[in-house]
A protein has these predicted regions:
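A structural detector for beta-sheet-dominated domains
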Residues: 24, 51-55, 63-65, 69-71, ...
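Membrane-insertion modules used to breach or fuse lipid bilayers
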Residues: 44-105
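Short, low-complexity, Pro/Ser/Thr/Gly-rich segments in the mature regions of secreted, periplasmic
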Residues: 141-156
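Low-complexity, intrinsically disordered short peptide segments enriched in small/polar/basic residues
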Residues: 14-20, 28, 47, 106, ...
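Residue-level signal for mature regions of secreted extracellular proteins and peptides
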Residues: 3-6, 61-63, 123-124
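N-terminal prepro-regions of secreted/extracellular proteins
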Residues: 1-40
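Membrane pore-forming effector domains from diverse proteins
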Residues: 88-140
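Intrinsic disorder/low-complexity segments enriched in polar/charged and small flexible residues
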Residues: 37, 116, 122, 151-154
């Protein structure tokens, strides 16, 4: 019986690659605060002024398929997208904002963070250690230190 030589291309003896994460896409995304007193609607027409003093936390989300570490994904996002990204931010809202509303329109204001929506993937060695394979994917909506009011109008 003869053994396959070490240079046999049908064998892969490489070391297993430690699983790692990659950010596969990003876009700007408004992460709204979800506590009472930070979302307003007024109209039709005129102007709206909001003033609020509130403390709370704006929290991001990480979702996906397969096994993954939200902390590792957030750490990767901090190094490849923006150092100001975090899982959550504790904030104190305390300012006044005024905006004109278009005729026959309703104005909406929502406080939150100008953050990012990310796509991510987790990679690892294939079972035969010949290839790198994607083992998990998902999305994350993460806040940054940039906070403020988002304004939009609707017909009703």
């Amino acid at each position: 019986m003869t053994e396959a030589p070490h240079n046999d291309p049908s064998r892969c003896d490489g070391p297993a690659i430690k699983p790692y994460y990659g950010i596969t896409g990003k876009s700007s995304y408004f992460v709204p605060s979800l506590w009472n007193g930070t979302e307003y609607k007024d109209g039709p027409g005129g102007s709206m002024t909001v003033s609020v003093t509130k403390t709370g936390t704006i929290t991001g989300t990480v979702t996906g398929s397969g096994e993954f570490s939200a902390g590792a994904i957030i750490a990767k996002a901090k190094t490849t997208v923006s150092v100001s990204i975090a899982a959550s931010f504790a904030i104190a809202v305390g300012h006044t904002y005024t905006h004109d509303i278009g005729k026959k329109k309703y104005g909406h204001l929502q406080y939150g963070s100008w953050g990012y929506k990310l796509s991510w993937a987790k990679y690892a060695s294939s079972a035969d250690r010949c290839h790198i394979v994607k083992v998990s994917t998902g999305t994350a909506k993460l806040p940054t230190k940039s906070m403020g009011w988002k304004y939009w109008e609707t017909a009703s």
